[in-house]
Amino acid sequence: MIRRILFVCSGNTCRSPMAEVLLRKKLARHASEWAKDTVVTSAGVSAISGSSASENATAAMKHKDLDLSEHQSRLLEAADIINADLVITMTRNHKKAVLALVPQALHKVYTLAELTALAELAHAKPEQAKKYRDMIQEVAQKTMELTLLLDQLLGNPPDIEDPFGGDLAEYEECARSISGHLDTLLQYLDQSQNQSQDQSQDPPQESSHSRDQSAED
């Protein structure tokens, strides 16, 4: 089960804090029980800890009735990655930086666009959703081939562009892009969590030895 989601960008002042508060809002409105228990955080691979969210990121979120005025940036640490169930980066370079810190986290680190592409595949062919997830897991074990194979599978999805230094319109566009990805991601997480719950509730399979023993009794 996914309980802890970590967003990662560069300075933790623009993209990842916007993604953090946007997803928190979407989870709060979501009806599923799992959403209520999910913890969302963010950090930056090159952040200066204690910095405020950028002025335009704060303004863009204010337009969505979200408050970033109290946000303080955090430098990404290995413990953040280890403790997270899912690590979502804004770009492939951020993903590489995460894996440089914790290589064994390969199976749970994706760019936001990669996850969206996977979610769309699962939505289009729900009967093959598990197949796609298993395929991603298998690919994740092959570090050297990961980027190439994911690009082939997901169509080389684009990164979330950094609006730092841009005007408010660029921040608004970045927020719209992140929000759209998160809507698709939320559908995928809901489907994935429901499948996990169904599997955990399946009765244990009776072994052939037990059936044979019962037949002899």
Regions of interest found by a model, annotated:
Residues 1-196, 202-217:
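Short polar/charged helix/loop
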